[in-house]
């Protein structure tokens, strides 16, 4: 268990750095769909090809459909992207898939999934500021301290609570399925944008919502 916990911490460090780098080189509308859509694909392919996980072919198709729906959200922006705006989110997605697998299997063999996740979360949070210092990103910490303490606290709390539920779910269902359903949170961001921020609901967003929902229904049915 401890070996998986150590590996998990290192992978989370990589994920956080590449996510930070992704947002430095690209807009949210470009970065987010690529990173979140790649994670479930990595988890699914590794699980099937190397870990002996057996999934119904309709579930696999539904996962692929769901990921396509997520990728579709950023379709208008991809043609304007440079290599870094694609590369860093893709690598971020690889880390998402990797830590999902490590955390999932670590939680399954531990006495308490929440305890496994909590210790990893705490140690990861303590290490990351030093990583930022080493890679020359101290300004990020300074900005959080000067401008975003409340948002940081809210973000950490919500991040812990939501990922604790995900890790618990890893012990109850196939990891590729949980990872894929986790990414449906992107629908919430669309609805918040439409109802609260008064963003326009265009054909691309509607198509994305429909495809993602079909993927979710397919996963649940099969």
Show where each model-derived region lies.
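Membrane-interface interhelical linkers
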Residues: 3-26, 75-90, 121-155, 160-172, ...
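Structural signature of hydrophobic alpha-helical transmembrane segments
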Residues: 3-12, 51-67, 112-126, 170-185
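Structural motif at transmembrane-helix junctions in multi-pass transporters
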Residues: 19-35, 108-115, 164-184
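Helix-capping/transition residues at the boundaries of transmembrane alpha-helices
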Residues: 23, 50-51, 107-108, 170, ...
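Small-residue-rich segments of transmembrane alpha-helices in multi-pass membrane proteins
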Residues: 34-46, 88-101, 150-163, 210-222
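Alpha-helical transmembrane segments of compact multi-pass small-molecule transporters, enriched
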Residues: 34-49, 64-65, 123-127, 162-165, ...
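Hydrophobic transmembrane alpha-helices of multi-pass small-molecule transport proteins
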Residues: 44-48, 55-75, 204-221
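Glycine-/small-residue-enriched transmembrane alpha-helix faces in small-molecule transporters
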Residues: 81-114, 126
């Amino acid at each position: 268990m401890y070996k998986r916990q150590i590996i998990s911490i290192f992978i989370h460090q990589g994920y956080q750095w590449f996510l930070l780098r992704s947002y430095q080189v690209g807009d949210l509308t470009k970065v987010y769909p690529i990173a979140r859509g790649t994670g479930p694909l990595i988890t699914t392919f590794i699980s099937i090809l190397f870990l002996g996980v057996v999934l119904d072919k309709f579930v696999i198709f539904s996962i692929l459909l769901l990921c396509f729906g997520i990728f579709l959200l950023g379709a208008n922006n991809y043609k304007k992207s440079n290599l870094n705006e694609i590369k860093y989110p893709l690598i971020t997605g690889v880390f998402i898939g990797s830590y999902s697998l490590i955390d999932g299997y670590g939680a399954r063999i531990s006495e308490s999934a929440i305890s496994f996740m909590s210790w990893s979360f705490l140690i990861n949070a303590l290490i990351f500021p030093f990583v930022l210092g080493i890679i020359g990103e101290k300004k990020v910490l300074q900005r959080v301290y000067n401008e975003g303490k409340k948002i940081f606290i809210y973000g950490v709390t919500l991040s812990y609570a939501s990922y604790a539920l995900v890790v618990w779910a890893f012990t109850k269902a196939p990891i590729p399925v949980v990872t894929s359903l986790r990414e449906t949170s992107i629908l919430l961001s669309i609805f918040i944008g439409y109802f609260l921020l008064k963003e326009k609901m265009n054909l691309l967003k509607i198509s994305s919502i429909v495809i993602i929902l079909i993927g979710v229904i397919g996963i649940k049915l099969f």
